[in-house]
Regions:
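A structural motif corresponding to the C-terminal lobe/cap of the Radical SAM core domain
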Residues: 6-12, 16-173
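Active-site groove signature of glycoside hydrolases
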Residues: 1-3
Length: 173
């Protein structure tokens, strides 16, 4: 048993590891970036090494949301093709999505679900956005008076500690 939250960040290291794991008969999954879809050799080696699922932190299917939380390096417009590429190598994609980002609306959340179904994601998991104190977004929300709950024990799901511009706390929960 081993754990690595960023197993494929160093692609050359991961490829070497996967070559050594091939043939062991171990089935496994990992967290990784959607960017692995750009490396066909890595995907082939991961599958041969037993990788059958990747949990991918897409966060949002809205480019504006990605930029708002400083993850603009992600490209929402490439997600559909990336999901298909990864799954075309026999590796299921488990999408990790954050709800309650700045541009989210009830319609955009429904659109995210529709997108994931149409793109063929094997699974999806949804998390509530939390603007933690001390982070740039958390500090920004505090300055704007959008933090409505300062209880540190509520900075986890299912609590909504901020006022969203378009969704109520009940809608987010």
């Amino acid at each position: 048993h081993f754990v690595d939250d960023n197993l494929m960040a160093n692609r050359e290291y991961a490829k070497d590891l996967f070559r050594h794991m091939a043939g062991l008969g171990v089935r496994w999954g990992t967290q990784t970036s959607i960017e692995i879809a750009r490396d066909e050799e890595l995907l082939d080696l991961a599958w041969k090494a037993g990788c059958r699922i990747v949990m991918v932190g897409m966060e949002s299917t809205s480019q504006g949301n990605l930029e708002a939380v400083r993850k603009g390096w992600g490209r929402a417009d490439r997600y559909r093709g990336a999901i298909r590429t990864i799954q075309g190598h026999g590796i299921a994609v488990h999408a990790l999505i954050i709800l309650g980002l700045p541009e989210d609306t009830a319609g955009s959340i429904d659109g995210t679900v529709d997108f994931l179904v149409e793109a063929g994601a094997a699974a999806a998991e949804f998390f509530l956005f939390t603007p933690y104190p001390g982070t740039p977004v958390g500090d920004e929300y505090r300055r704007e008076g959008r933090i409505v709950d300062f209880d540190p024990t509520h900075y986890r799901e299912p609590f909504v500690v901020f006022r969203h511009s378009q969704l109520s706390a009940a809608e987010l929960q």
